[in-house]
Design a protein with these regions (language model features):
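Conserved beta-hairpin
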Residues: 69-89, 142
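Conserved GNAT acetyl-CoA-binding A-motif
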Residues: 132-135, 161-174
């Protein structure tokens, strides 16, 4: 009410954000993959792959490992200290495991969906910039921890590395809700990708020397 004194009981102090750092070892791979799986459980493209919940939780962890596992083995996966969020970056010149992705699709999806999925993969590969770049195939926050700023914290820490090396960064946004976050960090939309009735992916490029963006 008007004129009411403000006491400590009335002041909301949010919990501090967890620290962000590189994943210490592959022994923590399962924790990072579980976080990404939870974070993508409401993602339009991820659920286009696996619309049934049981199928999603059965197969999507294997998809994460095939698509972005090179970040974990390559020492370029960023995670929060409590594993509430993860950003799985691939170094310049490192690519998703195409053989593992093809094998997973053939094993986990009906044959009548293979052509559309493989077409989507092909278009994603063709959309990458020609110059060497850091690639962010997956960034996710546990659904229970979203809207706290963890995604921004992950982006801020990991993009420092791109700026230190003066190398572009590239990603495909599979969820329109995330595009404003990427725009704030200097990514620019450069097209749209879809295949076989899939939800659209928006490829986004962050060009060299964008140091000013990581401070916002």
């Amino acid at each position: 009410m008007l004129g009411e004194a403000i006491t400590a009981e009335h002041i909301f102090i949010p919990d501090p954000l967890p620290e962000v750092g590189l994943l210490e070892s592959v022994t923590h791979e399962a924790s990072a993959i579980a976080t990404v799986t939870m974070g993508f459980s409401t993602d339009p493209v991820a659920r286009w792959f696996y619309p049934e919940p049981a199928e999603y939780f059965r197969w999507f962890p294997q998809f994460v490992r095939a698509f972005a596992g090179g970040s974990i083995s390559g020492g370029s996966a960023y995670c929060t200290s409590d594993y509430s969020g993860a950003a799985l970056w691939l170094r310049p010149g490192v690519h998703p495991d195409e053989e593992a992705m093809v094998a997973l699709v053939e094993k986990s999806l009906p044959k009548d969906r293979h052509a559309a999925v493989f077409e989507l993969f092909e278009k994603m590969g063709a959309g990458h910039p020609d110059e060497l770049h850091w690639y962010l195939p997956m960034i996710a926050v546990d659904t229970h921890q979203q809207n706290r700023g963890i995604g921004s914290s992950l982006m801020r820490h990991s993009l420092e590395r791109c700026d230190a090396e003066n190398v572009p960064a590239y990603l495909e946004s599979s969820n329109p809700r995330n595009i404003p976050l990427y725009l704030r960090f200097g990514f620019e939309p450069i097209g749209e990708i879809s295949a076989g009735g899939s939800p659209p992916l928006v490829p986004m490029l962050r060009r060299r020397s964008r140091q000013s963006f990581i401070n916002h």
